[in-house]
Amino acid sequence: MHERYVPADVEAAAQGDWRAADAYKTREDSQKPKFYCVSMLPYPSGKLHMGHVRNYTINDVMYRYLRMNGYNTLMPMGWDAFGMPAENAAMANGVPPAKWTYDNIDYMKGQMQSMGLAIDWSREIATCKPDYYKWNQWLFLKMLEKGIAYKKTGTVNWDPVDQTVLANEQVIDGRGWRSGALVEKREIPMYYLRITQYADELLNDLDGLGWPERVKIMQQNWIGKSFGVNFGFPYELDGEKALLRVFTTRADTILGVTFCAVAAEHPLATRLAQGKPELQAFIDECKRGGVAEADVATMEKKGVATGFSVSHPLTGEPVEVWIGNYVLMSYGEGAVMGVPGHDERDFAFAKKYGLPIKQVIASEGQTYSLDAWQEWYGDKETAVCVNSGKYDGLRYADAVDAVAADLKAGGYGDKQVTWRLRDWGVSRQRYWGTPIPIIHCPSCGDVPVPEQDLPVVLPEDLVPDGSGNPLAKSEAFLNCSCPKCGAAAKRETDTMDTFVDSSWYFSRYTAPDADTMVDARTDYWMPMDQYIGGIEHAILHLLYSRFWTKVMRDLGLVKFGEPAKNLLTQGMVLNETFYREDASGKKTWYNPADVTVTHDDKGRPVGATLNTDGQPVVLGGIEKMSKSKNNGVDPQVLIDQYGADTARLFTMFAAPPEQQLEWSGAGVEGASRFLRRVWSFGATNREALATRAGFDAAALGDADKALRREIYSVLKQADFDYQRLQYNTVVSAAMKMLNAIDGAKGATPAVLRETYGVLLRVLYPVVPHVTFELWKALGYADEFGPLLDAPWPKVDEAALEQAEIELVLQVNGKVRGALKVAKDASREAIEAAAVADEAFAKFSDGKPAKKIVVVPGRLVNIVV
């Protein structure tokens, strides 16, 4: 072996052995417990970032540790390969999205392989391949048969210049991101999946999951089960009687209603706008806004009075109807009751437009004011009804019951459970996605593609130009025959939401070569024992994948109803930011690698200059690594300079997996230095470490016993930390081990070999290359087999036994020394040894002991 640690050589050698042995190809094995661990599959954007490195290293460490502990472990990988970024890149570069995607996959796969990840590449999938998305289409048709998939009109963002539908993130300040045109809302037919049919189960099954509480709460809030009252305000228009329906969780405030607001798309708004240009103009303005709930939450709340009133169902008083830009047709009934006295948004709206504000609940001892909103105005915990006639004095629950009963008696409504969750719209008016398997026949209508004709293959040679969906212009794709009548027909040009692709890929990993969607192997591996990904996926991806899994179960495809038993949401990777700001306020961000930082005597940054010109830059603080802030670290540069093991070691040591990781160049250098020490010890002591002589543990000398005691004590802690996924303290334990071994004076070669072998196995899951090569070079592989399959070291409990123990010696409560006594010494023997110790003679001033306090195994305190 080389004297010097050369990461590139070490890692190339280890990876060569792993490839030759096909070391990570995994098969089902009923004789072993299984452990299926999956990192959320990446989008092939071009290059890995440090967030990827951290995620996959966590997965890899888990895999290797559990494989050493006898588990049949599986770590697969794939590519979430459809999506809008590929179309954008295609437009920018004039190449088909397919070429851009496959080139990126090739590069990123090479990066993963250079990290030494234990991936079974025989299971690799790419969601843009027909053999994968065929099953998206197949299950969609099954859901169509069962009524889970259905078609209805939905609202989208329409760019009138580019003549295309825009995703919410492509609408910037109400304008199309490419054309700059004012975006319009349009109603178009789309396909939906009835996720609401599973709302109760999705909510209730959260209790049995080993997921972070934060994620569970986010899903609970998104599902949003609400108990309230659905009722209507009666009105008459053009001789027709009807109800303007609303849903409220605050029926106790119903007598505080001073207006109603409806969405711009509400049928009543459409009717009232006829012949009224000012109303129609406002409706058109609303339709130009984004359709995302987040957009509505942050936009300025605007409204216009219709001049029309409905009647209050309990008092008969007129209630003015407004059209509001903050009311979404897709949520609730598309109408809301306005109670400005007890709702902050309604309060602001009423103040803006001079609408009446009525107080109908009050808390004792609190004064109501119209000057500004106060949090307690909507309090339902302590408030009671006031100014509400027969309901006065009732608390929230009793008031809701009474109001609901009266509304029901009048035929206006009743109690209702509602959900914030809405059915999942899966139609996307985009090219680079799974084609929806529907054919439009002029005679037969919408006809599902027959199962034997799947997949409907997406042409991969089209180049989007931003003016509509390329599929609509592709005669070869578009034109077909109706499966029912044989007449000329057209294919559906919408593609599926890319969340469909990522809703079941983990099941396909288990049977990637199956000629069915899944097979018996899926029930062996699934559900995932551990899923790893960012908190940003807490709602949509994780909720949709839970729904998709339940549908697959109900169709008899699988036996499980949840995709993942446990979830780990790794923390973000942070780094320093630096910028300069020009006269217009525009900021230019500089990568930390291009900046020199000065620090004060306490190590705090106090200034920074750009390396190219020596001029100052502003310290922008520590933020998440991102392209926008130019504060990322290229993993490939790191691997090329220090090696993959250093990158892995630093990302595991710098912080616990679930916490944020702050990047540190000094920390990376420290990780590299530690690995050089591990290697150097092995190289320097290779003759001693190659000694295979056995030993009698009972006959060992003090130095050997002390070293073994230290190593096995630390091993016990490291094992515990591996089990609780605290890999940072595992690395700390390994550092303690190396210090103990390196500093052991008088230890015999046989014990050095034993303890160094323990160190290599403890470190192996984190830094597999250097430990694998040392294990082989020092002869451990000849004795125990390759480190890949070496068993996890067992703690020698006998080595932890001590003939003597050390107690703290105190005199009058102050530490004055240490006292060594036999482990099984009696209290009397301990007291005698304490008063005989020279420390007592020195600090007692010749006074006799009045009292001796013995805390077994810890200390002796002599009171004089």
Curated annotation (Swiss-Prot):
Its main location: cytoplasm. It comes from the Bacteria. GO terms for cellular component: cytosol. Coiled coil: none annotated. It catalyses: tRNA(Leu) + L-leucine + ATP = L-leucyl-tRNA(Leu) + AMP + diphosphate. One of its GO terms (biological process) is leucyl-tRNA aminoacylation. It is found in: Cytoplasm. A motif ('KMSKS' region) lies at residues 624-628. InterPro entries: aa-tRNA-synth_I_CS, aa-tRNA-synth_Ia, Leu-tRNA-ligase, Leu_tRNA-synth_edit, M/V/L/I-tRNA-synth_anticd-bd, Methionyl/Leucyl_tRNA_Synth, Rossmann-like_a/b/a_fold, tRNAsynth_Ia_anticodon-bd. Keywords: Aminoacyl-tRNA synthetase, ATP-binding, Cytoplasm, Ligase, Nucleotide-binding, Protein biosynthesis. HAMAP family: Leu_tRNA_synth_B (MF_00049_B). Belongs to the class-I aminoacyl-tRNA synthetase family. This is Leucine--tRNA ligase. The lineage of its organism: Bacteria, Pseudomonadati, Pseudomonadota, Betaproteobacteria, Burkholderiales. The gene is leuS.
